[in-house]
Each structure stands twice: as structure tokens, then as C-alpha cells.
């Protein structure tokens, strides 16, 4: 073991290879994950009832008579500067509730805090604002055990000794024997007993985690070392004259995190937004452009032209970010490098697991655009075959399949959910021996029939989940059937009509829709393409725009404004958001008539509806059906609401 004075020195030692790991609090995990350290969380603490989260709370003595909304001028006890429950959450909350205000560009959060509370003990803040945040600390203001008011137990002691009026700690800090004398301050201005922390807290935050360099083998060795030590009580600090040494004393076990985990996925979108709000210099009134996330170059090209048309009074409403996949975009939105994008329902499900929310929904029926009320939006997932091929739902086993993409609604979740429920098997590769489902592992049988960019060179485009793969998306999956690369295409009900009988891009105009048929699930039924209402796999939720909670209102406002200008009958004829010149369904589905706002605070699951969510959950019983990102978001402690 290597002993350093504080966390930052340990982080540097790990980066340099002089040490391998350290347990950190969320706020420190944020720092460790930033450039130039680039460390990753590898193991998370788990507390009681299998939860790897805890609650940040504001604790006060009973009968002291003030509420969370009356904290100005009080004396405050904190676990340490930059720590989650002790600093980032309470100060971030005071900021977002408007009690604490930045006064100007040069002014830092610590300045505002030092004038907001009359006195404080914030361990580690000795060098800031002339030590004003240390006036309550008894001797030294260090972020270590020599300061009696450091850490959870210390901040509670500061309150107990009557040095402070309020302590910012976690829900497990107050000893059982003392609970009766203390209360929690709730955000709504009321008080509650200490055990009501689930309903009266400032935030639910990720567990402390062990952080190391990015090196899966090292991570495995560390996990083994920590989980095989016997005869030594890791999680108790009793006998060492202090609390929470190495691990929090309330830790019951350790959990290995997926290799793809990193600090922002682990901390989650909400906590990241909290930290970012502490980092910004002042509340600037200028609303910067909303950063749209484009997948691949064709989308980026359309986005760039949207961006240039979105300029009014010299200010852009839309800026563009690019990623190679939808999930890459989700990560950028979570990191605040991008703000929004429109995605398929199956991807809305994943976004929800990563704390993103649906803000607007694509509507495909003009009459719904003018009507008030909750947006109604569904389309039909269908299975298309060539007429005369003899393919029916009953003899699908052994055929070659064309999918819009792995994890997408019409292309994967609905058909594979049906295959799973009818045949009870998770062996999709055994059912369809080869196919094209862009986004699958390159070695998978579901990449065999994909075509890539068609350039004939190994450019990594084959099976990629973006428009560089010729068979990606709705039109791509239909084209895979047309070209004879597959026997059945799982797509949306309008796609054949959109790409035949003179409609669609060059490859499609000469096709006849009458050469294709729908097959109906669970039998030998077949139907004409136009009979989708009676012969479909499911009616499913529309594509939706996903974003972060903290920027939702700005995204909705921008889109409503852009739609007035560039929608179907927008005021500016120079650009149309719902048309794709160099491809299909770029940024939005081409069949979109308008976007409608989804009521605020609607979760991804509520938007998708129980029927569809249950279909996905059933599919998730099969291994390999959840993407790496989704698995990481779910295992990253606090992304799932209790």
C-alpha cells in the first residue's frame, strides 16, 4: 500500500503507475475520470438491501425550526470540498433552486457559498477565499482524519457539538441511537424523520467506487485480491480510531463493473449535470445553440446544412456533433458534448436506462399534428417477403433475415421477441443461420449478409449501425431483401410503398410493390403490402427525440421554433427538416409530418408503454440482447430508480 496525503495525490500516483487503485467518492471519481488522469471506476461498493447507491441528505437537530428554503445565514457542516453528499449535491441543489446565485463572471461558487452561510467547516477548502469556509473547523481544515470534522462522521459531529446548524451527509451517517434527536430537511420546505430518506433527500447518488487505470487484467487482479482476503474485516474501521477507512463502514460487498465503464457512465447524467452546474462561471442569459447528434457522415451533412439555415440575428439555434453510432451519441449527450437526437423506440429504452428522457415524438399522420392533447403515435412492424418465394411465418426457420439494426423496434425487438416467445429459444443465430442486423458483433452470423459501403475495400463499414452500411435502417433492410441477400425483411409498414412504383432513390424506383407481400405471424397467412393493419407483428411507439432532463425545455423550444420555419409547411422554403436529400431517414424519419411535445417528466418506459417494455424485458432474458452501453448504465448503480 502507498500512503498519500489526499485523494488527488493518489490519483496522480495511479496515473503514474506507482499505485494501482483507490476508493473514491463520486465527486472524486469525476475528477479522476477527467483529462489528464483518465482513470476508470472498476468496482463499486454495495450497501444494504443490494443497493449500490446512497442518498445525500441535509440533517438538522429536532425543533430548530428552519427549513431547506431558509438556509441562508445558517452555520454549515460539510464532509469535504468537492465530495458528493457534502458539497456537490447540496451546493448544486442550492444553485438549481435559486437560493444561491452567482454574482458575476469572476465569482466562483466558493465565494457565493462563503457569503451564503454565516460560518462553515468545509474540509479541504483552507486555501480558498481566505479560509472563510474553515471558520467552524476546530483545529485544521484538512481533508483527512486529523480534522475531527472531516468526512461523514466528522460533519455529523460538527452538528452534534452545536458548532453547525445543518450537516450535509448521507442517509446512513446518523447512528441509530441518535436518530430520534435529528430530522431531515426536504426540498419542499418540510422536515421528516431520519428514516424517511427515500422520500426526503437532496439526491440519490452513486456509491463510492474503486478507481484504477484502464486495464482490464489489472482490474480483475484487484477484484480478486479484494474479494479473497479472509480473516480481516475490510468494511469496518473499528479499532483504527476513525471511521470509513478504505471503504465506507456501511459497505456490505463489492461489485465488479463492466470493462466499458467510465466515470460519466458510472456517475450518471443527473449527477454529471449537478457537477457541471458547479463548474460554470456564471448564469449566462445567452442560450447557446442546441447541439444535435448526427450518426455518420450523411446525417452530419444534413445537420450542417440545418445548422447554417438555423441562424437568426447572427446566432445559430442548432450546432452539430457527430458519432459513429446511436450509442456513441447517447454517451456524448450524457457527457454534455451533445444535447439531443431522434431515435427508434428500442433505442429510447436504452436511453432511459442511461437517465435520458424522451422530449418530443415524431407524428406520421398529418391530422394528429393540429390536434391538441397527448401525442398518439404508432407505426406497424411488418415482415416482408418476395411474392412467390413461398416464405411464411411457419417456415421462417433456416431462412436469411434482413433487419434495420440490432436492438431496433421493427427490425429486431418485435420480430425476435416473437421468435423467442413462439419458439422459446434464445438461439437466434440457429433460427436464422445468416442475416444482416447492423450493429451486431462483426464475427456474428447477423453480419454475414451485410454489404458495407459497397466500395469493395475493407473500410470497416460492413455491418456498421449507420448509413455507411448499404443495408442499414428501414430502406436498407428492404434493399437487402430486394438484392436477394435475405429472404425476409423486418421493417415498417410504409417502407415498400416509399421505395417502389416510381418512389424513392435510384435503386428503388423501378421496383413494383405488387412483387412483395407481408407475412402474418403464427401461421401461413400472407397479405398484400397495403393490408398492414390486419397483417403485422405489432403496433409500436414512434421514434422520439431524447435529451437530458436539465436541457429538455430548451430542446423543445428550439424544435418547435425550427419546425415553424422548416417543417412540412414551414415559413422558409429553403430547407426542410423532415426530408433527406442524400439518403433515407436522416436525423428524422422521412415520413414525419411534425414533432409533438411529450409531457414533461414522462419517463422512457412510460412513453414506450407496458406492452412494448414487456416485449423488450422478455427479449432481455436472452444473453447478448442488451448492448454494452445499456448493461453499463444499468450496473452503474443509480441509473435505475427504486
Curated annotation (Swiss-Prot):
<feature type="binding site">
    <location>
        <position position="152"/>
    </location>
    <ligand>
        <name>Fe(3+) 1</name>
    </ligand>
</feature>
<keyword id="KW-0410">Iron transport</keyword>
<dbReference type="GO" id="GO:0055037">
    <property type="term" value="C:recycling endosome"/>
</dbReference>
<dbReference type="InterPro" id="IPR016357">
    <property type="entry name" value="Transferrin"/>
</dbReference>
<feature type="disulfide bond">
    <location>
        <begin position="77"/>
        <end position="158"/>
    </location>
</feature>
<feature type="binding site">
    <location>
        <position position="411"/>
    </location>
    <ligand>
        <name>hydrogencarbonate 2</name>
    </ligand>
</feature>
<feature type="binding site">
    <location>
        <position position="86"/>
    </location>
    <ligand>
        <name>hydrogencarbonate 1</name>
    </ligand>
</feature>
<feature type="disulfide bond">
    <location>
        <begin position="293"/>
        <end position="329"/>
    </location>
</feature>
<keyword id="KW-1015">Disulfide bond</keyword>
<feature type="binding site">
    <location>
        <position position="474"/>
    </location>
    <ligand>
        <name>Fe(3+) 2</name>
    </ligand>
</feature>
<feature type="binding site">
    <location>
        <position position="408"/>
    </location>
    <ligand>
        <name>hydrogencarbonate 2</name>
    </ligand>
</feature>
<dbReference type="GO" id="GO:0006826">
    <property type="term" value="P:iron ion transport"/>
</dbReference>
<protein>
    <recommendedName>
        <fullName>Serotransferrin</fullName>
    </recommendedName>
</protein>
<feature type="binding site">
    <location>
        <position position="208"/>
    </location>
    <ligand>
        <name>Fe(3+) 1</name>
    </ligand>
</feature>
<keyword id="KW-0479">Metal-binding</keyword>
<comment type="similarity">
    <text>Belongs to the transferrin family.</text>
</comment>
<feature type="disulfide bond">
    <location>
        <begin position="447"/>
        <end position="463"/>
    </location>
</feature>
<feature type="binding site">
    <location>
        <position position="85"/>
    </location>
    <ligand>
        <name>hydrogencarbonate 1</name>
    </ligand>
</feature>
<keyword id="KW-0408">Iron</keyword>
<dbReference type="GO" id="GO:0019731">
    <property type="term" value="P:antibacterial humoral response"/>
</dbReference>
<feature type="disulfide bond">
    <location>
        <begin position="520"/>
        <end position="535"/>
    </location>
</feature>
<dbReference type="Pfam" id="PF00405">
    <property type="entry name" value="Transferrin"/>
</dbReference>
<keyword id="KW-0813">Transport</keyword>
<feature type="domain" description="Transferrin-like 1">
    <location>
        <begin position="1"/>
        <end position="280"/>
    </location>
</feature>
<keyword id="KW-0325">Glycoprotein</keyword>
<feature type="disulfide bond">
    <location>
        <begin position="369"/>
        <end position="594"/>
    </location>
</feature>
<dbReference type="InterPro" id="IPR018195">
    <property type="entry name" value="Transferrin_Fe_BS"/>
</dbReference>
<feature type="disulfide bond">
    <location>
        <begin position="303"/>
        <end position="320"/>
    </location>
</feature>
<dbReference type="GO" id="GO:0046872">
    <property type="term" value="F:metal ion binding"/>
</dbReference>
<feature type="domain" description="Transferrin-like 2">
    <location>
        <begin position="290"/>
        <end position="621"/>
    </location>
</feature>
<feature type="binding site">
    <location>
        <position position="379"/>
    </location>
    <ligand>
        <name>Fe(3+) 2</name>
    </ligand>
</feature>
<feature type="disulfide bond">
    <location>
        <begin position="186"/>
        <end position="200"/>
    </location>
</feature>
<keyword id="KW-0406">Ion transport</keyword>
<feature type="disulfide bond">
    <location>
        <begin position="426"/>
        <end position="622"/>
    </location>
</feature>
<feature type="disulfide bond">
    <location>
        <begin position="354"/>
        <end position="633"/>
    </location>
</feature>
<feature type="disulfide bond">
    <location>
        <begin position="402"/>
        <end position="480"/>
    </location>
</feature>
<feature type="binding site">
    <location>
        <position position="344"/>
    </location>
    <ligand>
        <name>Fe(3+) 2</name>
    </ligand>
</feature>
<dbReference type="GO" id="GO:0005886">
    <property type="term" value="C:plasma membrane"/>
</dbReference>
<dbReference type="GO" id="GO:0005769">
    <property type="term" value="C:early endosome"/>
</dbReference>
<feature type="binding site">
    <location>
        <position position="79"/>
    </location>
    <ligand>
        <name>hydrogencarbonate 1</name>
    </ligand>
</feature>
<feature type="binding site">
    <location>
        <position position="404"/>
    </location>
    <ligand>
        <name>hydrogencarbonate 2</name>
    </ligand>
</feature>
<keyword id="KW-0677">Repeat</keyword>
